[in-house]
Amino acid sequence: MVGYTEALTDPSYNGQLLTLTYPLVGNYGIPDPKITDEDGISKYFESDKIQIRGLVIHELSLTASHWNLSMTLDEWMYNEKVPGISGIDTRALTMKLRNSGVMMGALVVSDSEIDVEEVKKQLASATHYDSEQFMDEVSTKEEKIYGSEEQTVVIVDTGAKNAIIRNVREIGYRAILVP
């Protein structure tokens, strides 16, 4: 099980609108992204940025409390220009998604009235999720080496989470991340 910080930065969710079913999200905030382990890998994030295109939740906690708090979820998403929506029956939405499979969707943010028909047109003409090339966005561009042990595990980065690298390191191997 992971928290929302790990989920939002998980490369496997790149390009998706992520729906969380827990009724209250944001109550422990976001930890300091500068906190890393001895290999320089973030301790609390699965990649170096938010990977999702939008977040759908039932209720956002605007008050966060945690010993490692650096900002609220709302502040983090605002700073990273990732839209979110609350007030949604996420459990009903999840059941619809479970029955229907992947569906195209849009979160539209505007200071003026939203033209729903225009949004529908844009969504209909958007690149379908199945056709997008996410590998270019989530893969490392250059080889990265973690540790200096003789025994080595090579990780072909097709969207590898930081946790995979951390786990390889924890069992005593050098990790080499390659594109």
Put a short name on every predicted segment.
Residues M1-T152, V156-P179:
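RNA-binding accessory domains that recognize and position tRNA/RNA substrates
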